[in-house]
Amino acid sequence: MTHPSRPVLLHVGTVKTGSTSLQAYLQQQQAWLAAQGWAYLPAPGRRDRRDLAACCIALGDERDELLRSEGLLAPDQRLGHRQQVRLQLQAQLAALPAGHGVILSSEHFHLSLQSPAEITTLRQLLAELGLGPVQVVIYLREPVGLMESLYSTMVRSGDQRPLPADPADPFVALICDHSASLERWRGVFGAEAVQARAFPPPGGIGHDLLALMAGVQGPFPPEPRRQSNRGLRPWALALLRWLNRCLPWFTPQSPLALVRGCRRVLDTALSHGASGSYRMPAAQRRRYSERYSGAYQQLLGREGLD
């Protein structure tokens, strides 16, 4: 059974474009959104809709980190997950007033749905739930700064891997080749339905997204000024790299609550006392810039975002 057609804004969260902060903002403003005829629908117990992304990954695909983290590798597990998410969304939609639009957001829409077939599965699932028309919003960040910020996040999470030396690495291309990303999504949802936005928007990502939504009028609720994921100075990153290498068990993902707590305390202290930014070595930065920066500026021009 489907619900009456209702508009949906699908936020395809690209890497290091404030998705976590945006999701927290939308979740905090549910009452305000309801008064505007909209609702933010995260997964139960989450801030985002990664469960919906996991539903749409090809059944034979076991490569995806999201599937491994959620324990969804066997075909019967995947099919059961799809049914569970469908029922959860149906219940959430049934609780909304008729005609209210919904906002769905996840970084995994971008990271995990890497083929037109997977994006098509998402489109079909939304249609089966009575969601439409669909407006897709994708924020795009300058690729070199994106990768430098990503490396800082990787180190803070306990990761020991360096940034790929080759900017043509498939993972780097996935998150830095913005033209290819837009082409995948527009090939499924249509060019007019997919809107690119430059990150960071001058008024804040929350206000920028709200301004794109039909029927939503300002003034908008204020956004938090504090950054939830600030960068670190080079010496602070070097300290964390040393800890990751010498004490690989001392990570934010440790099964021990005491270890996780101590790492959070250290991270908080560094965020307040050593906030800054990481820069790649000059030669590596030049290779990344030569491959992606010019194409990014051209894309901004084509999209009218320069």
Residue ranges of predicted features:
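Anion-recognition interface
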Residues: 2-306
